[in-house]
């Protein structure tokens, strides 16, 4: 069905009609039913009001259960402009900024119902319900009839409207995508200022994390009126531990604070907070996460009974007080309770969908909902399950009985009752772990509990509470047994155990989906069962169940490199090594699924890396060049504007004055931007592709080598000066660093790796966060391995102590080769060591104790690689045949800039990328006319192997990409719309079993199809596409393209039109520079701060 949006700019949108049921605009609802009810064959229509997580769960379950009878048609009306998205994962939006990544189902799902009518409205609100006529009225004026009405209107975030200043600019709530987008926009314009989250519950911690992840605010503070966070889920001990962990992460938490007033300026902008205790706090932004209010406004005019605390009152069948109207999710009030977490809503969806589709079976009842939660909040694992406050409030239930709502707390107040609950508590202040489990007085039944830091046993314990079976072990074993560690394991769980509370998925659901053949990958399991698509906390357990079920069926869980290679990276390495396969074609014929496959952007670089790790060929040799990522293809890192960086090797950070002069002369001659790197060398940016050969010729003549900054290989070995100069030095760190860098330079590995050597325990070279690091001792060096910085920093681990200098090399040889042999694709040593069975102790056994008996072989392999070393740039500049690769265009010597250059701090750089790309339908553009035009000689392209070659050509002001694949030609625009980068001709070509080809953009891996009916479509980002053109080789030796007139071509695809220009992006320092303009110090200039006159401080005062 088409997307049905509500009014935008005054528009009115009306949905389509099905099965004779009209949707009429502006007609009295009493006239609408007509003869509809008299048709005995018609399907009943269910109208769902709301399109959130619970609503879409209900629809999915209803469709599945109604697949045979096909009794119902469905209309769903959503108020937001988006289809249903994962509100639990809302904070991840800050990372990817793509709403599509949050969609619970792709847009195509909404049009996939072939056996029933399914309509959906977006941007449309239901304003009235007419139960007597069974119709609803929308904000567009449409009248929609129903047989069954399901209210899933959700809830609104609460704002403290009685607090002065609650309506100021800078006040936000954390509830919807639009809330986040407004917060992001505000934060971008208030960089460096203070943001505040009010509310210490689940939503408040999520909001605080989101504001922190924005990285725009200078600081973020959390305000909570309670004595500890998560007061509804945790007791004082547990909540205080979570508070401590959050503070350790850098978030300031203020407890027992109530907002009395919000301070504002004359323009009603937030400037601060006044608390009830008189304390004040300066801030520019306040995000309130203090609770939710059920959306029950439709109840007033409709006559639906609503609870005093809000929400449509429902019974155990989810019925409201009005016939044929049901309520589910956060808008429903059951026994005077509403539920702000998703699990009870999913349970309601289960009950209602079952009852509507199984009228001949015993109906399900919505009884005591499971309010258990397991989450990772600000990096802290938190869980509560069962009756987790039974010790504080008294048990809500006891095995074998369930007290009514009225009987709880109805005992004689003058009678002192015996406690009915015993608590078993475990605290580990060193590991940051807290557990409290609540049992009946005899210890035979588990009632509930809470966990901080270690939540592995959550699923098992929660199931024990639900089953209400007597325990088979004493309570003490629940604490002591949890200390054995290990991954989450589902082997001893019953099939009825709920593993995903967000979507009420049991272990049996996952097992059945795999055994039936419906799900063959973990992605299939997520799509089919919805497990793991909510908060994601259940994924380790889901993965464990999937793996075990596949193994039980005799099927191995795939860790294949890609669709073309049925081996893991480590297995493929062994196949290539043992069979001595030396080319991509040899590998595909011997190890690929299809011998003549082109491979893809995943397997090509991986195979190229393995071949380099084993045989060290030159990357620019014909049979290897087309396998490389763009950086390796041109022996330089590609930058934002299509230029490249130039990084000579500076071993150990030591460099002579002559080489510094040579670098400076090259940078000045070619107008390169210079920067000192963290690896103690000089990076020169802005080198044009056509200048790379000349630049490197001068550097090679000056005695310099490639620094391999472009490669998945050794980058640098950083050092402090050690005993070379430092009076505190214990060892010669520079000498050792230079020897290590000279030995391992150019060695290809699964990922880049870095080293460092410190001359003493002061650790100035930061050796303990490198892939390998040495720290000098009085007896030699301590060797550390498996560390890295980056997005997920890891401290390295000690491999060996007090190693003499002459014994360092054998140990590192074995370590590096073992990593190369066994790591997964693109896996850093940190992640490799974490996933290595046995971890550091196993690595010591292999590397130090030669447990596998391969130490000598690994040393020999490393020595062969070291002996095969050559400088890639030295060999390249001496080979004139490689010059053709270093041209901007294959058909002309002209050059153009793809991004406008700006001058800053006496250097040049490309201007900032704008936020949005080129959002035009290039694929669907209709040209006025097309004619065949010769563009380039056919002999430019290779006849293979490899079976691929490409070229970037210039036609007018337009850049075009031509690809030769297995003897056929394909042509597209050169610009990738994502970031308006002109690079597609340098992208890797992939194929599938159906003969479909695609080119993968070198920048961010957008894959564009080259052939077939969908040529030009982006496979992994439907928001963009590219233009394609007919192309062929003719007998005259030229390649011809069918193109429009040059003027028309340039008007759509011209470089000048799409070149990124200054001013398109927001200057990130605009606010900073405006605020601190002119503050340069007394000696920066005679004028001092702009607009003020310099003054002399009295001589007898301190001049601060």
UniProtKB/Swiss-Prot annotation:
Domain Rieske residues, every copy: 932-1040
Binding site for NAD(+): 146-176
Entry keyword annotation includes Transcription regulation: no
MF annotations from Gene Ontology: 2 iron, 2 sulfur cluster binding; 4 iron, 4 sulfur cluster binding; heme binding; metal ion binding; nitrite reductase [NAD(P)H] activity
EC number(s) given by UniProt: 1.7.1.4
Enzyme class (EC, first level): oxidoreductase
Keyword Iron-sulfur: yes
Sorted UniProt keywords: 2Fe-2S, 4Fe-4S, FAD, Flavoprotein, Heme, Iron, Iron-sulfur, Metal-binding, NADP, Nitrate assimilation, Oxidoreductase
Biased composition range(s): Polar residues: 1094-1104
Protein name according to UniProt: Nitrite reductase [NAD(P)H]
């Amino acid at each position: 069905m088409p997307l049905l949006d509500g009014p935008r700019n005054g528009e009115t949108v009306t949905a389509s009609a099905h099965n004779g049921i009209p949707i009429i605009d502006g007609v009295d609802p009493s006239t609408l039913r007509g003869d509809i009810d008299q048709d005995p064959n018609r399907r009943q229509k269910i109208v769902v009001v709301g399109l959130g997580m619970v609503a879409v769960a209900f629809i999915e379950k209803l469709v599945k259960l109604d697949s045979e009878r096909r009794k119902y048609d469905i209309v769903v009306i959503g108020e937001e402009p988006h289809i249903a998205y994962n509100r639990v994962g809302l904070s991840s939006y800050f990372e990817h900024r793509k709403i599509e990544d949050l969609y619970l189902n792709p847009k195509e799902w909404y049009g996939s119902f072939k056996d029933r009518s399914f309509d959906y409205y977006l941007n449309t609100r239901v304003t009235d319900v007419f139960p007597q006529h069974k119709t609803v009225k929308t904000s567009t004026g449409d009248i929609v009839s129903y047989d069954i009405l399901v209210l899933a209107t959700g809830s609104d975030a609460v704002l403290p409207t009685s607090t002065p200043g609650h309506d100021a600019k800078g006040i936000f709530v954390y509830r919807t995508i639009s809330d986040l987008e407004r917060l992001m926009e505000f934060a971008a314009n208030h960089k460096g200022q203070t943001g505040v989250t009010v509310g210490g519950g689940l939503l408040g911690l999520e909001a605080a994390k989101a504001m922190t992840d924005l990285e725009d605010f200078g600081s973020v503070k959390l305000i909570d009126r309670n004595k500890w966070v998560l007061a509804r889920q945790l007791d004082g001990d547990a909540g205080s531990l979570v508070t401590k962990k959050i503070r350790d992460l850098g978030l300031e938490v203020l407890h027992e604070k109530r907002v009395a007033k919000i301070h504002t300026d004359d323009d009603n902008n937030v400037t601060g907070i006044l608390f009830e205790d008189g304390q004040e706090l300066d801030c520019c932004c306040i995000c309130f996460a203090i609770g939710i209010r059920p959306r029950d406004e439709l109840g007033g005019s409709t006559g639906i009974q609503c609870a005093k605390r809000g929400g449509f009152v429902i019974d155990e069948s989810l019925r409201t007080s009005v016939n044929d109207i049901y309520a589910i999710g956060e808008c429903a009030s059951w026994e005077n309770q509403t539920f702000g977490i998703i699990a009870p809503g999913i349970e309601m969806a289960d009950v209602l969908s079952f009852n509507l589709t199984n009228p001949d079976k015993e109906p399900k009842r919505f009884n005591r909902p499971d309010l258990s939660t397991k989450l990772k909040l600000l990096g802290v694992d938190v869980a509560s399950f069962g009756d987790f406050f039974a010790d504080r409030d008294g048990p809500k239930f006891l095995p074998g009985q369930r007290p009514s709502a009225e009987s709880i707390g109805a005992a004689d107040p003058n009678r002192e009752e015996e406690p009915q609950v015993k608590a078993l508590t475990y605290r580990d202040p060193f590991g940051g772990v807290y557990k409290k489990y609540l049992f009946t007085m005899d210890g035979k039944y588990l009632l509930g509990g809470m966990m901080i830091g270690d939540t592995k046993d959550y699923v098992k314990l929660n199931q024990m509470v639900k089953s209400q079976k007597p325990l088979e072990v004493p309570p003490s074993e629940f604490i002591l047994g949890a200390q054995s560690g290990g991954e989450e394991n589902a082997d001893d769980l019953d099939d009825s155990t709920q593993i995903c509370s967000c979507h009420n998925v049991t272990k049996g659901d996952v097992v059945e989906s795999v055994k039936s053949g419906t799900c063959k990958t973990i992605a299939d399991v997520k799509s089919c069962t919805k497990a793991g698509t909510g908060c994601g906390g259940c994924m380790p357990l889901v993965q464990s169940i999937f793996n075990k079920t596949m193994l039980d069926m005799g099927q191995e869980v795939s860790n294949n490199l890609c669709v073309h290679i049925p081996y893991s990276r480590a297995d493929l390495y062994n196949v290539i090594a043992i069979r001595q396969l030396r080319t991509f074609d040899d590998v595909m014929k011997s190890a690929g699924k299809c011998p003549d496959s082109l491979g893809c952007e995943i397997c090509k670089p991986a195979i190229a890396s393995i071949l380099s790790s084993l045989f060290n060929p030159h990357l620019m040799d014909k049979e290897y060049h087309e396998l490389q990522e763009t950086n390796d293809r041109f022996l330089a890192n590609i930058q934002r504007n299509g230029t490249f960086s130039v990084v000579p090797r500076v071993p150990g950070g030591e460099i002579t004055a002559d080489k510094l002069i040579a670098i400076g002369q090259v940078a000045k001659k070619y107008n390169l931007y210079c920067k000192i790197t963290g690896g103690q060398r000089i990076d020169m940016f802005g080198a044009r592709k056509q200048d790379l050969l000349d630049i490197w010729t001068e550097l090679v003549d000056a005695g310099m080598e490639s620094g391999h900054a472009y490669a998945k290989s050794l980058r640098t070995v950083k050092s402090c000066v050690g005993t070379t100069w430092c009076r505190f030095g214990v060892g010669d760190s520079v000498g050792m660093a230079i020897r290590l860098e000279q030995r391992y330079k150019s060695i290809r590995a699964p990922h880049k790796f870095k080293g460092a050597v410190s001359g003493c325990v002061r650790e100035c070279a930061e050796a303990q966060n490198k892939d390998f690091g040495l720290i000098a001792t009085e007896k030699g060096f301590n060797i550390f391995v498996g560390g890295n910085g980056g997005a997920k920093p890891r401290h390295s681990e000690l491999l060996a102590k007090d190693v003499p200098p002459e014994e360092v090399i054998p140990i590192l040889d074995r370590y590096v080769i073992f990593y190369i042999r066994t790591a997964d694709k693109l896996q850093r040593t940190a992640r490799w060591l974490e996933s290595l069975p046995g971890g550091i102790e196993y690595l010591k056994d292999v590397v130090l104790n030669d447990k596998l008996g391969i130490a000598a072989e690994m040393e020999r392999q490393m020595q062969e690689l070291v002996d095969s070393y050559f400088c890639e740039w030295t060999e390249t500049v001496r080979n004139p045949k490689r010059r053709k690769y270093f041209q901007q265009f294959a058909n002309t010597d002209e050059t153009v800039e793809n991004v406008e250059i700006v001058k800053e701090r006496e250097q040049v750089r490309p201007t900032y990328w704008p936020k949005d790309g080129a959002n035009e339908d290039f694929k669907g553009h209709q040209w006025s006319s097309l004619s065949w035009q010769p563009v380039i000689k056919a002999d430019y392209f290779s006849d293979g192997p490899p079976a691929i070659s490409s070229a970037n050509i210039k036609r007018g002001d337009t850049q075009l990409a031509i690809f030769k694949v297995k003897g056929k030609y394909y042509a597209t625009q050169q610009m990738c719309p994502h970031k308006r980068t002109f690079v597609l001709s340098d992208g890797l070509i992939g194929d599938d079993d159906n003969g479909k080809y695609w080119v993968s953009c070198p920048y961010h891996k957008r894959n564009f199809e080259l052939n077939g009916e969908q040529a030009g479509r982006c496979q992994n980002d439907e928001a963009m596409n590219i233009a394609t053109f007919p192309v062929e080789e003719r007998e005259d030796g030229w390649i011809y393209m069918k193109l429009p007139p040059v003027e028309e071509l340039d008007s759509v695809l011209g470089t000048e039109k799409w070149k990124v220009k200054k001013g398109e992006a927001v200057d990130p320092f605009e606010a900073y520079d405006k605020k601190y303009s002119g503050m340069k110090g007394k000696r920066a200039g005679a004028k001092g701060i702009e607009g003020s006159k310099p003054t002399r401080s009295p001589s007898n005062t301190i001049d601060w």
